[in-house]
Curated annotation (Swiss-Prot):
Family in the record: Belongs to the endoribonuclease YbeY family.
Primary localization: cytoplasm
Record GO biological process: rRNA processing
GO CC terms in record: cytoplasm
GO molecular function, one term: zinc ion binding
Name of the molecule in the record: Endoribonuclease YbeY
Amino acid sequence: MELQLRDHTEGKLQPSQERLAEKALAQAAERLDVPEQAEMSLTFVLNPEIRELNRDYRGIDRATDVISFAIEDDDDLANLPAEIRAELPVELGDLVISIDKVTEQALFLNHSADRELGYLLVHGFLHLNGYDHEEPADEEKMFTLQEEILDGLGLSR
């Protein structure tokens, strides 16, 4: 999977956090059997930027921890021949994570910033791949998978 990583944190993002992001997303992609030609972006921001995105796209005027913008819509590709679809990159979408919220929530929840970052990465990635937690059965499925991936990264609760 191709990952485009952007850092809008004015120096707050640590190299170890970038490495964790790459590792967590690669492991999640492998677990979900995401095609190698899949593409996504990950942008790390500060609270003011994610607050603006949250307000503009979700109508909620406060900072949040992660926002997922899924791009791929299978309906758009359904009319193309299978051999052409197989050659096209799979556009998963964009994740935006507030590095400020990673720190705040890790302190509040009394666990490591790595655990919090891993959680947000995997949670957002699952949303990009069609998982949600609107219904109890879907929530159980998503959260179980999420914890299994985090356990595999050594980021257990």
